[in-house]
Structures are given as structure tokens and as C-alpha cells.
């Protein structure tokens, strides 16, 4: 830096010229000549002598200033920043980011671009000015210092010479220095300027930097081992006819040292100084200063992470908070377990104590204040899929009596009972049903009827008392007090003999225990209907699956109900015991959907005796009649083998009742009737057709039991009151004489007689089976006529009471109105159903506890795997993975919502059909107790554990939005699964559809398929994806305002999270739109689920 020492000598040059010459310095008086002889050949051209030669730095006559490198390809100089021209002698303007596009200075000074300054516009002033030099064109920092500052990459300094005497000597001329260093090359260079004209320049190499930082002072030191300088021709200090420092530059060998001092608060010691042994001696001798003094400003454009002293913010994981959250969630689970244990130990209701008298009065009024209901029906027919199931059934069920509907399997008993109970049938129903001679619409009719299904469907987690009480609370009058309803429940329990088991759980085969027995369950089902004191009670196979003792107890309870409270009880029954049959008041016998008998049970045996189908002694008449309809329904054939049981004994007399004391029919292995053993094999062989093999014992017994006997061949079906009292059985000849007149009776088939098969009467036209004969006999019997007359009389009396004309149109009108009562309101229904649902939930807590335990365990595991997410690209990828995993976990765990209604589908359908409650209250209670414990709490538990462990943004607004998105997503997924579970009845199909829907939604989340890569025609599918809404909302909430660090170009570049999200196809402004989308899908799916339940889960039999 010899130029600094010589700066003060300019005014003294004329005076000290002899001295400099004596000391070896040279002052030129003539211009140097260009030497061209050194070139290997002489270039000759037609260039005129007045034109200068073209610049070519490869020729000795030309050189590169600023010690620029000569480009061997174009003969031009590669200049350092801020200099240009062919020889790097011209300062450039504009700004550093312009690079090769910078323009040479025109005039005495440069017009720099905004944010740039200096003689050659190399000094930055603002951060925005540096952005253009950054790889991503943002994040730039103008690193400026006054008298100091470490060179990070390549810095530039603008200095003012502060030696007082030097400035005084130059007067108005301003000495300045530009100085720059490049750390990678360990080089520096400077230029000396007088009035912004460069005089000379120097280059330093093998440089070292050091910063000494103390509490009050920063000291920056540059030390370069080598130094060389050069002149700009015809400039001050490098004049061709005046002072030239070039000979002095040859003596500068270094080392050179440049120091800058900056103190806290500023002091007179602040500044920069340059020292070099030769220069220091000259300055000391001439100006009395130790070195050249400068006041410098340095600047350097850096990426913000490269600024010295910059430290990326270090995330602090709050370990105590994490431990506290995990402990709190664990304590919550323990609390839930303890609560469940306490509730399961506590009895559902305290032991019953005596209630107030007014409760007894209300219960008594309920039982007594009703109008006896006599049920009449005629011409009941039913068609489904073009097939007739029932045909022309007629009968009466009277109050105070029990009416039994019997028939073989497939006879249509249950179908007929459903029609009487006004159940919703899939087929077409014809006929008339009257109550006390009047017709009623379905809503009025169902107010006073109760129906007990064959299968007992109840919640296994409720006790007997709770099950019956729920029926009472929901179905008894609104103005009836709870105490009176409980009193009514206890009365029914005692009446049915189940009071002693009132606190036992119903139970099930799949549960922890079997619970109560099958007979007890049947009585509980009956109690649920009896508690409402219906005027008409229908029961489908009430003895099904019960042993004989329990079956009798159930029927006896029904008989007591009918007799004691004047109720009408109608039930179907299959093969009852004789002691049960004896309790019947009315009997309806069906065969293949047709009426074989319908009337008083007391007339049944006499009726069948008189038409020739006497129940053998010792047989249960119910079994006999059911078997009779089965055998009679078989096609008739004269070729069937026959057995002669009466040809040998014309004095045989038969009884009119199975209760009379006569010998019983033997078993199939020893079938006989009185004196049948007297028939020898010779007689039997004569009676058997010659081409037929011997009849089996079963066929023989069936022929004995179910073939019409003599004494029944009357001109018309007999009236049970006109039985032949002597019981005389006609002889074979007398029987044979009756075939002709019987065959002439209006299409009736003469009864089949046990006689010689060769003498069987011909089959009458119009009938295929003996069942047709039985049906025809009944239709023309006095019993049927009596029933028909009674129905007609009842209808006419009702019409007369209502003041209507006796006409067919009047009889077809709906005129009746039941004396029903107001049921409880929707709010009360919701409270009762919520209580029932809550009990069912906490008494079967495994699903709920599994959800909670899974949430805690997977939250801790996820927090461990993703612990302390970093703010870089790797951390961004881990965030994507974390959010994707959380959503997949909750999405597929909500498949348990498929079973919310499947396990209670049948229960709901039946309770709805029986008028327990409104569907909306049941749906609301079920959804509420599925959403709160299973869909709301687990994501909150998991969120509060995962969020602090993985180090997501530690701000309450972001945390709240994170939890909100998880909860809404869980609700939306649960709503979709709920809808699927209702629409698809089969659990396997529902699980498959639910899984496919979740996978489809997962595909459009935004991680597996970029938004911008989705075809335009399929883009609308993404609007249906709940995973897309939730995934985008979570990642936008976390990353939008986050700055991620990406290591590129040797720098730690901070990349805005928003730009990365945009590259992945996410919308940075879509957070609340996504939240709204999740909310809409949640609401729409739940509404659609209710609509599906309301319209699809309707009882159709």
C-alpha cells in the first residue's frame, strides 16, 4: 500500500524531485515508447498512421489494469467487479447484480441504482438490493459495518483518507480508496482515487482475517503476505511527464496489514489503519503519523443465514409439559375405568319401597279405564309376488278370551298375525278388520294394540327392570307420574313371575354371561307390552324355544291377563301341550293359508267328529289337527295303499272326544285300533291291490288316523250341536250308499272312507287335495255361519250407533276412534333414550376404552418417532408423514361406526313399529353417545400429546386449529361410515364399502397425488375427499408462515413454507375453506344417515 504513503507528497513533488532522484526514484520527462520488436513477427496492415491499434491483451503493448486476467480467446481482460472496458480501466455503474450488463461511467460520477452507492456502485445499502443476488431472489441481507466487519464471502469498502496534513495539502481534491477482499481466494485489491479518478491500484494475496471481539470493542485485522501495485497512465502520481510512483512500487514486498477498530458507543480510537514497513517509514518521516489512517464503510450481500453471528432459532421441547399431558390423559383413562366400575356395581334402581297411594290410583285407572275390544275380521287374503298366501280367513277374537292361531309350518300363521296387527307387509292385503264393528286407520288402531315378536330382541346390557321401565316411560301416558309408571312395572313383573330377577342383566350368548333364561326373556318381552295395558295383545309363537313348564306359565299369564282385565289376547302357537290347549277360548286352524276351522275351541272336537275326523283316544287334539292339515294338503290318489280297520267289525263305536276313555292308537311300530289285531293276514292281502307292495307301518297308521270315518257322510256339513249322541258308526254298505248323493253336493268331495281300495269313491271335480274338502266343509258349516252372522251383526250395530245408513259404502268407511293417550314428548324421549344408550355404553366399555388406550399409545409412539421436527426440508417431509398417519389412523378407526346401528337394527325396527319413540330422538341419542366418547375425545387426547412432542408451532391459535381439524375430520369420517352402516345391512359389504371409500378419499389427500397433476375432468372428485380437506388444513396451518432451511449452492437458504406448499399443489389460503368443507360433509353425512334410517329401516314383513 505504498500509494497511501505517497499520497501526502503530491504538493511537494517539485521541491523534493532532486531528493527522490538522489535516492533512486525516477521522474520521467518523456513518454514511454511502445516496443513492438519483441514480437516474433511484425504485423503490417493498411491501418492509417493516425488510427491506434486494436486492443489485444495478448500483445506486449497492452496490459490489463486492476491485475485482471487476459482472456486468451478474445484478447480482452476479465475485470473484477465494478470495472470494465477492454483493459479494466473504466469504472462501471448500475449495481453488482447486473453483472456483465453494467454500463461504463459517463461523466465524472456514476448514477447507481436504488440501494447501491460508491464510486463504481459496489456498495449495497438495503437488504432488498441484495435480494437480486440470492439464489431464490429473496432473503438477502446487506451486511454493513463502519470501520470493521469480517469478510464472509466477498466484501467491498469505501474509505476516506483521514490523515489531516494529507487532506490539507490536497485542499478541494478528495482522496478516496475502494477496497475489496474475496475470502475464498484469500485475495484483496484496492484502488486509489482523486476526485473519483483512479490513479493507481494494488493487489494483495495470501491474506488472513481475524476478529477479536470483546465486551466493549471489536478489532478486525487483515494481513496479506504479498503486495503489488500498478499505475493508470497519465493520472496523478502516474504521470508520464511528472511524478510517477511506479519505481517505488517495486520496493513494496509486504507484508501489509489493515486493521479496523470499533468501540461500543464510539470513541476517537475508531477507524481503520494501513501499515506496511516501507510506507510506515515514509509517512512517519513526512507527516508524523504512524500509518495511513482511513474511515471506511464495508458492505457485503449475504443470505441471511450466512450473516456472522446468525443462529437459526432452536426449538425447545417442553419436556415437563409433555410428561404432564401424558400423565393427565392416563389419569383420564383411569378415571373413566373407575367410573365404569362404580356404575356397573351400583344397582340400576334402589330397592322398591312402597309408593304413594296416588300411584296405585293412576295404575288402577290405566288398567280399568279402557274399552273392551272385540276384533272381527273376514275375507283376509294376502298376495306377494303374484302368489296367494292367505285366502278368505274369517274369525272373531273377543275380550276376556285368548285366541290361538294354529297350523303347520308354512300355513301362514305369522303372516296372518302380522296382518291382524296391521304390520307393514311387502305384499298386498285384502279383507276387512273391525274393532267392535268399526274400522280404524293404522295410527288409531296401533294406539291400543301390543305386539310381541317370536324372537326376543332386547339390549343385553340392561337389567330386566330397566328394559320394562324404558317401555313404560316411553309409552305410558305423558301425564302419568314416574312413580305410577314404576308401580305399573312392578305389578307386571309380579304378574308374570319375573320380579325376583328384576335386577339381573338380560345378557346374551356373546356377552360375559348368558343372563336370564329363554323363558324369562319371553316373559320380559311380554312384560314390555303388558306394561302399557293394551286392549289387544298379539304374540307370535310365545312358547317358541321354551320347555313345557315355562310354555304353560307363559300361556297361563296371558289367560290371567285376558280374564282379569278383560283384554283380547291373540297368539300363534305350534304344537302346544294338551294342558295349554285346554286354556284356549277361540281357535283358528289354518292349512296352506286357508281356514280349516275358526270358532270356539269348545266346538272344535265335536265339529271334526261330525265331519269324520275324530281325534283318536289319547291323542293331543292340537297335534292331531296340525297333522291332519298336513296330510290333507297332499295330492289325493286312489292308488295309495289302504288299510281296512272297520270291515270286520260293524259294531265298532267311536268317541266324540279325545278326552273320552278309549284305547289309544299304538305307535308306528305297533299301530292298531280296537280289535284291529283280529284282522288276519289273509284278509289284509285280499284288501291290498294285487300290484302294490305291502304298506309301511307309517302309511297304515296315517291312513288310520287321517282318513274320514263312517258316520260323517251327511248331506251338509254337520253342526257340532247336532252330533249323533249314540255315536253309531255306519256300516260299510250304508257308507257306500252315500257316495252318490255326496258327490252331487255343489262341488263337495265325499269324504275318504277306510274301506277296500277297489271300492273307493271317485274324486269329485274341482278339488285336488283333502284340504280343499276340509276348507269347503268349514265354509258351509254352522260354525262358520255363526261367525259370519256375529261379524255382520257387530258391524251393523256399530253403524247404527254412529248414525250411518246400513249400506256397503258405510261399512267400508273408517269411522272408529280409539281412546288413546298422549305419549311423552321428543325431549323426554331423548332423555330416556340417552340414559339407555349411556348405560349400554359403559356396561360394554371395551370399544370406548380401546379407542382411548389406542389414542394414548399411538400418540406417544408418533411423538417418539417424529420427536423435535426440524425446520428444513426433512422436517417438512416428516410433517407430511405425521399428518398423513394421523388422518389415516382416525379415518380407518371410524369404521367402528358401521356397527353403531347394525347391532341394534332389529331392535330399532321393532321398537319403532311398536311406537316406542320417534326415530329422530333415537338417532340423536345414538349419534351423541357415539360422537362425544368415541369421535370427540380420542382426537383431543392424541392431539394434546403429539403436538408438543413433535414440536409443532407453539402458539395457541395454531394448536386450536390443529385440534379443530382433527375433530371435524373424525366427525366427517364417522358420519360417512354411519351412513354406509345404515344403507348396507350386511356387515361384510358395509366394511368393504367403508374401506374403499376411505382409500378413495386417501388417494386425493394431496400427498399421493399432486393437485396440479389431477386431470381436469377428475378434479371434482377431490372436493369429495375428507382427507384432502383435513390434510391441506393441517399442513397449511403448520407450514404457511414457517421458514424452512434448504442447503443449496453451499448456503443454508431459507425458503418460505408457502412456496413449498404451492409446489405441492396446496392452497395457502384454503385453511378455513377446508374447515368449512369438513363441517359441511359432517353435517350432510349425518343428515343423510338419518334420512336413510328414517326411510330404509322400516319394518316390512
Curated annotation (Swiss-Prot):
Per the UniProt entry, the disulfide pairs are 93-110, 112-121
Predominant location of this chain? endoplasmic reticulum
Task: State where ATP binds.
Answer: 407-414
Q: Which residues lie on this side of the membrane: Cytoplasmic?
A: 342-845, 902-935, 983-988, 1037-1050, 1099-1101
Q: Where is the ABC transporter domain?
A: 375-617
Domain EGF-like: from-to ranges = 84-122
Q: Which residues cross the membrane?
A: 321-341, 846-866, 881-901, 936-956, 962-982, 989-1009, 1016-1036, 1051-1071, 1078-1098
The UniProt record lists the keyword Disulfide bond: yes
Domain of life, source organism: Eukaryota
GO cellular component annotations of the record: endoplasmic reticulum membrane
Coiled-coil positions: none
Q: List where in the cell it is found.
A: Endoplasmic reticulum membrane
Family in the record: Belongs to the ABC transporter superfamily. ABCG family. Eye pigment precursor importer (TC 3.A.1.204) subfamily.
The protein's name in its UniProt record? ABC transporter G family member ARB_01379
Amino acid at each position: 500500500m505504498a500509494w497511501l504513503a505517497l499520497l501526502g507528497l503530491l504538493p511537494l513533488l517539485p521541491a523534493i524531485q532532486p531528493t527522490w532522484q538522489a535516492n533512486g526514484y525516477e521522474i520521467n520527462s518523456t513518454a514511454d515508447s511502445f516496443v513492438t520488436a519483441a514480437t516474433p513477427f511484425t504485423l503490417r496492415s493498411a491501418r492509417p498512421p493516425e488510427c491506434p491499434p486494436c486492443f489485444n491483451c495478448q500483445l506486449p503493448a497492452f496490459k490489463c489494469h486492476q491485475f485482471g486476467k487476459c482472456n486468451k480467446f478474445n484478447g480482452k481482460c476479465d475485470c473484477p467487479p465494478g470495472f470494465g472496458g477492454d483493459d479494466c480501466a473504466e469504472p462501471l455503474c448500475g449495481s453488482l447484480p447486473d453483472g456483465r450488463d453494467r454500463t461504463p461511467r459517463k461523466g465524472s460520477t456514476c448514477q447507481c441504482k436504488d440501494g447501491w452507492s460508491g464510486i463504481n456502485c459496489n456498495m449495497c445499502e438495503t437488504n432488498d438490493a441484495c435480494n437480486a443476488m440470492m439464489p431464490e431472489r429473496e432473503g438477502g441481507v446487506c451486511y454493513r459495518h463502519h470501520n470493521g466487519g469480517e469478510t464472509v464471502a466477498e466484501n467491498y469498502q469505501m474509505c476516506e483518507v483521514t490523515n489531516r496534513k494529507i487532506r490539507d495539502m490536497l485542499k478541494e481534491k478528495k482522496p478516496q480508496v475502494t477496497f475489496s477482499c474475496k475470502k475464498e481466494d484469500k485475495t484483496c485489491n484496492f484502488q486509489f482515487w482523486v476526485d473519483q479518478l483512479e490513479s493507481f491500484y494494488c493487489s494483495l494475496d495470501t491474506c488472513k482475517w481475524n476478529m477479536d471481539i470483546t465486551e466493549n470493542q471489536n478489532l478486525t485485522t487483515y494481513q496479506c503476505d504479498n503486495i503489488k501495485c500498478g499505475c493508470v497512465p497519465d493520472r496523478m502520481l502516474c504521470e508520464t511527464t511528472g511524478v510517477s510512483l511506479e519505481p517505488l512500487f517495486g520496493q513494496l514486498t509486504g507484508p501489509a496489514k489493515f486493521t479496523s477498530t470499533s468501540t461500543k458507543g464510539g470513541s476517537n480510537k475508531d477507524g481503520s489503519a494501513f501499515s506496511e514497513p516501507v510506507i510506515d517509514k515514509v509517512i512517519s518521516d513526512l507527516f508524523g503519523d504512524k500509518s495511513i489512517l482511513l474511515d471506511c464503510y464495508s458492505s457485503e450481500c449475504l443470505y441471511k443465514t450466512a450473516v456472522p453471528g446468525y443462529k437459526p432459532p432452536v426449538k425447545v421441547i417442553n419436556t415437563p409439559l409433555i410428561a404432564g399431558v401424558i400423565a393427565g390423559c392416563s389419569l383420564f383413562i383411569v378415571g373413566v375405568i373407575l367410573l365404569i366400575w362404580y356404575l356397573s356395581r351400583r344397582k340400576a334402581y334402589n330397592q322398591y319401597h312402597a309408593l304413594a297411594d296416588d300411584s296405585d290410583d293412576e295404575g288402577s285407572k290405566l288398567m280399568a279405564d279402557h274399552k273392551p275390544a272385540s276384533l272381527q275380521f273376514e275375507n283376509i287374503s294376502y298376495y306377494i309376488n303374484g302368489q296367494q298366501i292367505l285366502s278368505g280367513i274369517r274369525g272373531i277374537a273377543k275380550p276376556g278370551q285368548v285366541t290361538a292361531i294354529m297350523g303347520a309350518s308354512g300355513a301362514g300363521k305369522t303372516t296372518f298375525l302380522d296382518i291382524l296387527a296391521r304390520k307393514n307387509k311387502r305384499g298386498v292385503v285384502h279383507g276387512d278388520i273391525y274393532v267392535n264393528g268399526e274400522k280404524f286407520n293404522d295410527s288409531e288402531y296401533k294406539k291400543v294394540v301390543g305386539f310381541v315378536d317370536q324372537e326376543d330382541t332386547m339390549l343385553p346390557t340392561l337389567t330386566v327392570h330397566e328394559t320394562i321401565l324404558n317401555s313404560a316411560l316411553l309409552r305410558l301416558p305423558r301425564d302419568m307420574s314416574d312413580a305410577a309408571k314404576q308401580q305399573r312395572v312392578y305389578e307386571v313383573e309380579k304378574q308374570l313371575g319375573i320380579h325376583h330377577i328384576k335386577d339381573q342383566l338380560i345378557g346374551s350368548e356373546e356377552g360375559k354371561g348368558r343372563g336370564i333364561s329363554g323363558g324369562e326373556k319371553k316373559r320380559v318381552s311380554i312384560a314390555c307390552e303388558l306394561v302399557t295395558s293394551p286392549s289387544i295383545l298379539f304374540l307370535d309363537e310365545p312358547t317358541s324355544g321354551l320347555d313345557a313348564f315355562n310354555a304353560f306359565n307363559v300361556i297361563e299369564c296371558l289367560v290371567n291377563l285376558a280374564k282379569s282385565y278383560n283384554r283380547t289376547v291373540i297368539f300363534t302357537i305350534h304344537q302346544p301341550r294338551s294342558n295349554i290347549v285346554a286354556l284356549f277360548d277361540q281357535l283358528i286352524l289354518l292349512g296352506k293359508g286357508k281356514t280349516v276351522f275358526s270358532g270356539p275351541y269348545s266346538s272344535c272336537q265335536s265339529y271334526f267328529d261330525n265331519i269324520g275326523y275324530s281325534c283318536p283316544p289319547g291323542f293331543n287334539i292340537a297335534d292331531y289337527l296340525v297333522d291332519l292339515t298336513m296330510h290333507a294338503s297332499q295330492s289325493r290318489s286312489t292308488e295309495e295303499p289302504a288299510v281296512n280297520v272297520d270291515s270286520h267289525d260293524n259294531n265298532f263305536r267311536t268317541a266324540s272326544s279325545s278326552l273320552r276313555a278309549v284305547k289309544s292308537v299304538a305307535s308306528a311300530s305297533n299301530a292298531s285300533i280296537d280289535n284291529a289285531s283280529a284282522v288276519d293276514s289273509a284278509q289284509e292281502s285280499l284288501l291290498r291291490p294285487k300290484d302294490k307292495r305291502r304298506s309301511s307301518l307309517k302309511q297304515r297308521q296315517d291312513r288310520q288316523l287321517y282318513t274320514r270315518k263312517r258316520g260323517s257322510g251327511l248331506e251338509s256339513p254337520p253342526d257340532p250341536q247336532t252330533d249323533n249322541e249314540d255315536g253309531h258308526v255306519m256300516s260299510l254298505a250304508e257308507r257306500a250308499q252315500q257316495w252318490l248323493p255326496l258327490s252331487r253336493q255343489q262341488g263337495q268331495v265325499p269324504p275318504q272312507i277306510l274301506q277296500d281300495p277297489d271300492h273307493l269313491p271317485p274324486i269329485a271335480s274341482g278339488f285336488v287335495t283333502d284340504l280343499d274338502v276340509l276348507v269347503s266343509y268349514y265354509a258351509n258349516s254352522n260354525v262358520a255361519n255363526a261367525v259370519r252372522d256375529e261379524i255382520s251383526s257387530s258391524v251393523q250395530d256399530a253403524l247404527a250407533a254412529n248414525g250411518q245408513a246400513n249400506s256397503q259404502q258405510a261399512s267400508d268407511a273408517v269411522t272408529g276412534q280409539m281412546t288413546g293417550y298422549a305419549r311423552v314428548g321428543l325431549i323426554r324421549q331423548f332423555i330416556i333414550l340417552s340414559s339407555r344408550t349411556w348405560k349400554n355404553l359403559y356396561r360394554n366399555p371395551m370399544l370406548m376404552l380401546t379407542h382411548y388406550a389406542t389414542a394414548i399409545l399411538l400418540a406417544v409412539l408418533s411423538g417418539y418417532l417424529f420427536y423435535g421436527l426440524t425446520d428444513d426440508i426433512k422436517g417438512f417431509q416428516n410433517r407430511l408423514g405425521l399428518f398423513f398417519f394421523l388422518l389415516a389412523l382416525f379415518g380407518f378407526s371410524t369404521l367402528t361406526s358401521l356397527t353403531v346401528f347394525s347391532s341394534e337394527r332389529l331392535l330399532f325396527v321393532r321398537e319403532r313399529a311398536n311406537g316406542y319413540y320417534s326415530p329422530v330422538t333415537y338417532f340423536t341419542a345414538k349419534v351423541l353417545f357415539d360422537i362425544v366418547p368415541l369421535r370427540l375425545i380420542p382426537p383431543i387426547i392424541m392431539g394434546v400429546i403429539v403436538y408438543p412432542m413433535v414440536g409443532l408451532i407453539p402458539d395457541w391459535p395454531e394448536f386450536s386449529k390443529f385440534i379443530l381439524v382433527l375433530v371435524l375430520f373424525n366427525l366427517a369420517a364417522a358420519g360417512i361410515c354411519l351412513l354406509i352402516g345404515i344403507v348396507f345391512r350386511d356387515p361384510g359389504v358395509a366394511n368393504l364399502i367403508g374401506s374403499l371409500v376411505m382409500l378413495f378419499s386417501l388417494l386425493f389427500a394431496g400427498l399421493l397425488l399432486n393437485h396440479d397433476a389431477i386431470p381436469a375432468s377428475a378434479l371434482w372428485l377431490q372436493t369429495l375427499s375428507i382427507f384432502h380437506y383435513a390434510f391441506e388444513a393441517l399442513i397449511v396451518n403448520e407450514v404457511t408462515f414457517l421458514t424452512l432451511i434448504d442447503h443449496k449452492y453451499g448456503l443454508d437458504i431459507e425458503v418460505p413454507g408457502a412456496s413449498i406448499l404451492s409446489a405441492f399443489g396446496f392452497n395457502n389460503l384454503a385453511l378455513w375453506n377446508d374447515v368449512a368443507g369438513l363441517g359441511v360433509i359432517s353435517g350432510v353425512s349425518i343428515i343423510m344417515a338419518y334420512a336413510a334410517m328414517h326411510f330404509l329401516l322400516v319394518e316390512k314383513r
